Each structure stands twice: as C-alpha cells, then as structure tokens.
Regions:
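C-terminal outer-membrane beta-barrel translocator/porin domains of Gram-negative envelope proteins
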Residues: 1, 50, 92-193
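Transmembrane beta-strand segments of outer-membrane beta-barrel domains in Gram-negative
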Residues: 1-120
C-alpha cells in the first residue's frame, strides 16, 4: 500500500511525500525443508542464515523530482506539464520504522535516478535511464520486492512500473547487496526492420 501526496512548488520541481506499507508472507513455508537445506549447505554464511517467514514494513517516504526547463500549458486552473529538453533528476528516500502497525523491518534506502526521452524526429525517440540505490541500514531486507531489478521499457513512459520484467537473483540470497547500479537505453522507431 502506497499513500503519496505531491506538490509542485515551482515549475518542474515535484515533491512527493507519504508512506509505503507492505505485508508479505513466505508462501509454502516448510520449516523442515528449510532447516535440512541449511544443514546440507554446510558451514559459512549459509549455516547462520536466518530467513524470516514474514516481512511487514511501514516506511515514510520522500521523493523529489526536478526537470529543468519544463514546458506546460494551463487547462482552466489546472497546470498540464508537456515535457522538457532536459533530463529529469529523481532523489528517493525511504526509512522503515520497526514496531509501527506491526512492522518487523527497519531499513533506510536512498535512490538517485536520471532519465530522459529525446525526440530524434517526429516518430523516433531515444531514451535513457541511469541510477543507483543504496541501503544505508539493513535488517535482513535483501531487496525482497525486486523493485530495483526490473526493466520498464514502455513507449508511453519510463515511469510505468506495471510493465517490464525482473531478473531472477541468486536463489539462496535473493540479493544481499547493499547497493545497486542500473542503466537502460532504448531506441524507439516504427518499421525499424523495413
């Protein structure tokens, strides 16, 4: 559940604030199979691994998006953003609070992203997106929702989080990394094979 409110104090600067809440349970959890697997894995890190059966999180969130040189028009009293020839810079901060609404997760996440779609002519576009993220505080979180590992390559916009795919990560750890880098480049053209 994401509850966000946004405001645009000046042209091109969007500030979004809200909370993100997740309730997740491990499907088909079998204590014996998991224990046997960990025993067979032997010593080292996997021997001491504690996998939770529930991930409940409550996280206040702040997102700042800035697009310099944003063009817009007014539709009555409503401002309609059209686009810009400059890239959009995004800074996203989230902090999970343990004990609020039954959350058992405490984390802190910071992400930075730059994205732009460049019109080459009337029907061709070149888009790019580059960013990185870091968990500055982790409590067995391991990127459980795969949010940062999918490609969103939708012609309507880069911000469509429904489309795309995600890459499967190592089956033992999901992703225990504290940071990630990502980059996408897309060239869109009709009749590209003709």
């Amino acid at each position: 559940l994401d509850v966000l409110h946004n405001i645009e104090p000046v042209n091109g600067l969007m500030i979004k604030a809200g909370v993100s809440m997740h309730w997740r349970k491990l499907a088909n959890y079998d204590h014996l199979r998991l224990r046997d697997f960990l025993q067979q894995a032997g010593g080292g890190i996997l021997h001491n691994l504690s996998i939770r059966t529930e991930y409940n999180s409550f996280a206040p969130r702040l997102r700042v998006e800035w697009t310099p040189g944003m063009y817009y028009y007014m539709n009555g009293r409503r401002k309609m953003n059209v686009g810009s020839s400059m890239p959009t810079f995004i800074l996203d901060y989230e902090r999970g609070l343990k004990g609020v609404f039954g959350s058992n997760d405490e984390h802190e996440r910071v992400e930075f992203d730059v994205q732009q779609k460049i019109k080459l002519n009337r029907i061709r576009t070149l888009g790019y997106r580059a960013g990185f993220g870091i968990f500055t505080k982790m409590d067995n979180v391991y990127f459980v929702d795969f949010a940062n590992f999918k490609r969103s390559n939708i012609p309507e916009g880069w911000n469509d989080e429904i489309g795309g795919t995600f890459q499967l990560l190592d089956r033992h750890w999901y992703n225990s990394s504290r940071r990630y880098w990502r980059g996408h480049v897309a060239y869109e053209s009709p009749f590209i094979l003709l």
